[in-house]
Amino acid sequence: MPPKTRAAGAKKVRRKEKKNVAHGHAHIKSTFNNTIVSITDPSGNVISWASAGHVGFKGSRKSTPFAAQMAAENAARKAQEHGMRKVDVFVKGPGSGRETAIRSLQAAGLEVGAIQDVTPTPHNGCRPPKRRRV
């Protein structure tokens, strides 16, 4: 009897492993249109993530502080399943969901250590978009 082989189109599925990480980093990227929350271990491997669009908001509602709050709660809940208890927060971008996302990480049960703003500022690099005329 010949050895069993995989079907031509079948892929090898990597099972999601349960990491047990007590301390990590929460990266909050808050733009004018969306808020993305990624929770990583100290070396930068993503443990959980959520965004306002991923949580179920569409269009202009993605840019609201409430959408950022829901995204942060969702990411924190997933991270706590992996044993996360304490995070250092890195905030990037000018969006409206920055403070709300940090507050909801605390409310979800994660202990927030340091909060750092890592918004990139150009040393006169690219030309910015033109001013809106409404």
Swiss-Prot record:
Against Pfam families, the record matches this protein to: Ribosomal_S11 (PF00411)
Q: Which UniProt keywords apply?
A: Ribonucleoprotein, Ribosomal protein, RNA-binding, rRNA-binding
Tell me the superkingdom of the source. Answer: Bacteria
Keyword Transcription listed: no
Q: Where is the signal peptide?
A: none
Q: InterPro entries from the xrefs?
A: Ribosomal_uS11, Ribosomal_uS11_bac-type, Ribosomal_uS11_CS, Ribosomal_uS11_sf
UniProt key word Isomerase: no
* Gene Ontology CC entries for this record: ribonucleoprotein complex; ribosome
Annotated GO molecular function terms are: rRNA binding; structural constituent of ribosome
GO BP term (any one): translation
What functional role does this protein have? Located on the platform of the 30S subunit, it bridges several disparate RNA helices of the 16S rRNA. Forms part of the Shine-Dalgarno cleft in the 70S ribosome.
- What protein family is recorded? Belongs to the universal ribosomal protein uS11 family.
| Oligomeric and partner information | Part of the 30S ribosomal subunit. Interacts with proteins S7 and S18. Binds to IF-3.
Its protein name is Small ribosomal subunit protein uS11
